[in-house]
Regions:
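Gly/Ser-rich catalytic/binding loops embedded in alpha/beta enzyme cores
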Residues: 33
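C-terminal nucleotide
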Residues: 1-16, 20-22, 29-30, 40-87, ...
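Stable alpha-helical structural segments in soluble proteins, enriched in small hydrophobic residues
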Residues: 108-120
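Glycine-rich, flexible N-terminal cofactor/catalytic loop recognition
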Residues: 36
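Glycine-rich beta-strand-to-loop/alpha-helix junction loops that act as flexible
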Residues: 104-106, 284-289
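Gly/Ser-rich catalytic serine loop of serine hydrolases
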Residues: 96-108
Length: 317
């Protein structure tokens, strides 16, 4: 059995840009170090049954990639023989990243496979220019389509680059610095665990179908995208008041126009935050379950209002 260098790939959080990214909005995504995955022959996070399942899933995935290669469609050169050989030897993706939680379980796997098996791969260095980042995102998007039917490539890009990334539009990507965490800050960003998983593909399909209605696409472009983009700009500049005024509108839009993406039992909680202005909730990834993102100007007040839920604070300001 081979020894392989075991690179770790973290989960990610899409702070802003879910769904609107499909129609060329801005997006901001950050690595999330609470969860990680590694390609290995000696798993420590998975039990025997899970390890066998991981290897079997990778065998199916290898078939998908092989078909793309044989059709001359894969956007980069992949050492499929080495991948299949490692699958035969029992390689697994030893991951603590929860699936269906909107934190990039498939993105981390794609990033790990690209790093190990891509020939002449684009390196994950800070010096990459925009054209290389676009090319890399497109290659990773093609790989991730297997899991979701449609992929922007952003999740695996974050997992691979291991740094916050700002999508300005489909043709412009930058590595960015996050505003500094103020450990004594009153405000913060937090996660709520819904305790259920969400399925990305059906929800993305639902959204895309809905956008075929001219009226719905109109409000996406005239309301959702401006709220989203303004949130990103003000967050990166540290303009808290402006960010929260846009967050309130963004949260209201998601509840009013995209409620199928919000688990039913959390809709009242969502509404409560908007009404009390103690916190604002938004989707974390495609929704339907997994984590919900929350923003508050007073984390202690929000904790009292959300005392029945497990809250994980991920950033303070």
């Amino acid at each position: 059995m081979k020894n392989i260098p075991e690179s770790k790939f973290n989960s990610k959080i899409l702070l802003f840009g879910e769904y609107s990214l499909i129609y060329d909005s801005m997006a901001l995504s950050i690595p999330f170090e609470s969860f990680e995955g590694t390609l290995t022959f000696s798993p420590v996070k998975l039990n025997n049954e899970q390890a066998k399942e991981s290897t079997a899933h990778m065998a199916q995935y290898a078939e998908y990639l092989k078909n793309l290669i044989q059709a001359g469609e894969l956007k980069f050169v992949l050492d499929i023989d080495a991948f299949e050989e490692d699958i035969a030897q029992g390689i697994v993706f030893d991951s603590s990243i929860p699936q269906g939680y909107g934190v990039g379980s498939s993105g981390a796997l794609v990033a790990a496979l690209y790093e190990k098996y891509a020939i002449e791969k684009i390196p994950n260095t800070a010096e990459l220019g925009n054209s290389q980042l676009i090319k890399l995102k497109e290659a990773l998007a093609q790989m991730e389509c297997y899991f979701h039917g449609k992929s922007s490539g952003l999740d695996p890009l974050i997992c691979y680059m291991k740094r916050p990334m700002l999508i300005n539009n489909k043709q412009s990507i930058d590595a960015v610095g996050m505003p500094e965490t103020n450990i004594n800050g009153k405000g913060g960003i937090f996660l709520i665990d819904t305790g259920m998983t969400g399925e990305t593909q059906p929800l993305v399909n639902l959204f895309v179908e809905k956008c075929k209605e001219e009226g719905f696409l109109h409000v996406i472009k005239d309301e959702l995208i401006p709220f989203n983009n303004n949130c990103i700009k003000s967050f990166l500049k540290g303009e808290v008041k402006d960010m929260f005024s846009n967050l309130k509108e963004l949260s209201k839009f998601l509840l009013g126009r995209m409620s199928p993406m919000i688990p039913r039992k959390f809709r009242q909680l969502w509404k409560q935050g908007i009404e009390t202005e103690s916190y604002y909730l938004k989707l974390c990834g495609s929704g339907g379950g997994g984590f919900i993102l929350g923003f508050t100007e007073d984390i202690e007040k929000a904790k009292i209002e959300l005392k029945d839920y497990h809250i994980d604070v991920i950033h303070r300001f």
